[in-house]
Swiss-Prot record:
Function: Odorant receptor.
Membrane topology: Multi-pass membrane protein
GO molecular function: G protein-coupled receptor activity; odorant binding; olfactory receptor activity
Localization of this protein: Cell membrane
Organism: Homo sapiens
Keyword Membrane attached: yes
Pfam families per record: 7tm_4
Gene3D superfamilies (alphabetical): Rhodopsin 7-helix transmembrane proteins
The protein's name: Olfactory receptor 5W2
Amino acid sequence: MDWENCSSLTDFFLLGITNNPEMKVTLFAVFLAVYIINFSANLGMIVLIRMDYQLHTPMYFFLSHLSFCDLCYSTATGPKMLVDLLAKNKSIPFYGCALQFLVFCIFADSECLLLSVMAFDRYKAIINPLLYTVNMSSRVCYLLLTGVYLVGIADALIHMTLAFRLCFCGSNEINHFFCDIPPLLLLSRSDTQVNELVLFTVFGFIELSTISGVFISYCYIILSVLEIHSAEGRFKALSTCTSHLSAVAIFQGTLLFMYFRPSSSYSLDQDKMTSLFYTLVVPMLNPLIYSLRNKDVKEALKKLKNKILF
């Protein structure tokens, strides 16, 4: 690429979800409601865990950070997408685009790894409940959490640096509602083979590590549960895992479909619909899954409700 003839763009133009004027108002109302529920539910989960002493355990410590990740990466994309549905000017500054991608990637990657850490936490709780608080001390929890965020930051910086040093000298229209890597690579006039290789390798490593961690943890959990003689004991042990497994299945399933399907079947329109699901819908579902299926969270909500009313 001749870099001297490659002019630097000052901004990008996000084409958004649809160009149909009749659908825009309806989609705005629907996604605004989804985002408000998402924001309120995740913020509420964080506040509830901080306020209720009974929820000051490793499991809920990690759950509060799962809600924090959901809140951050959905907020990185949601408000801009909502504004663009009604605004005439859908531009985003070049560095604003880079920042949006950076924040989104940090917290999406962190959530991916955090789900694996939460599986490890469930393994420690079930395999040896008497030593659970010792094995999962505050120091261990913070070390695991620090590792999660450091990997998320490192991965995001690698992809951002490689993507935003490419040459964008043609169209500045991104066929998406936020600055994601695949549509940016399609827009670039540079050779993107290195970017694609790094994206596949690094993201593949994170996905493989996460899925392997969850799989190994639950193999040990199942073996441990099988040693419990009473049906009630088995049910109690597994009941704490169902919410986590639901969250893993929804999040990982969406990501695998998004980034690991054959290039021959790749469609930007399909990509946008899938992105909408995991940037807005999945973050909304996580706190609902954990609150509706978790006895401790239900009890904490009842106590908070009684405090407010009385």
